[in-house]
């Protein structure tokens, strides 16, 4: 791929499947045009998937520091999720999906409980129990 060819590179739920993420960051930086964007997401609290090729879980701090390390500017990372009960539901979903009605009730209860807890906690719960992260890094 020629250098500085693309305005944007999209990378949704791929990075955790690549053992050489350092090469990915440098290669994406190389192929993005000046002022281009590297946009993507990674799971965090989520079951292993596509095994045996699910290598990493990346934290907010890791994404911010490593994208900057590889020369990206204006790095923004946003937590995805809702709270501890939705995080628990997402881990149980592979089993709950076989009981669709029960699964929907569990999901509703999880949203209600997370909303109730959020009333009493000052910290945004998705910052403590992120299902994943969405990021935008500008060249």
Regions found by a protein language model. Give the residues of each.
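Short, glycine/charged-enriched secondary-structure capping and boundary segments
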Residues: 23-26, 53-56, 92
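Preference for well-ordered, secondary-structure-rich cores of eukaryotic proteins
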Residues: 40-41, 65, 74-79, 83-85, ...
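Short catalytic/ligand-binding loop motif for oxyanion handling, primarily in non-cytosolic enzymes
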Residues: 46-50, 83-88
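Short alpha-helix
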Residues: 55-71, 77
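Conserved SAM-binding loop
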Residues: 1-49, 60-64, 135-137
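Aromatic-acidic/polar surface patches that form glycan- and anion
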Residues: 17, 56, 126-130
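A C-terminal cap/extension of S-adenosyl-L-methionine-dependent methyltransferases
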Residues: 84-139
